[in-house]
């Protein structure tokens, strides 16, 4: 038998999920309920998955990039992910490798979502845009680390030149 507190939490989840679906529709999105009570939605060409818990929503941008465990760039990518995760916003997650040695890259962001928040459509647009910013920060950090590594290699062996630069 459920207690009144459990019933209240269940109602909050349903109400918050309904509010989120309505908000996403107002933004021109077409949200879909999927298994496990989650909601899938596309925004500006990116696919997001939302899971609800009380007044909180965990938003995932799943599998937007991948890398093989044997890729020589993996250490640099890990370092770039760590640097990007110091920024405010979504956390970038490097998943465990699958049976083929492929590691997916995801982003996750936990937000408060409640009817008392002003302008929920703008709030969600800003929230989604943080995902794009996190990806951009990852690319910026990766490219900066790549340049630093190339400078370090050039300084170690000045006679070793890149044949593509001739």
PLM-predicted stretches and their roles:
Residues 38-39, 57, 103-105:
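Hydrophobic residues embedded in beta-strands of well-ordered beta-sheets
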Residues 1-53:
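Charge-rich, low-complexity N-terminal segments
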Residues 141-166:
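Short, highly charged C-terminal tails/helix-capping segments
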Residues 63-108:
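Short, internal acidic amphipathic alpha-helical interface segments
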Residues 113-129:
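A short acidic/glycine-rich loop-to-helix N-cap element
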Residues 49-67:
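A short acidic-to-branched-hydrophobic micro-motif
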Residues 130-134:
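Glycine-rich, aromatic-bearing surface loops/beta-hairpins
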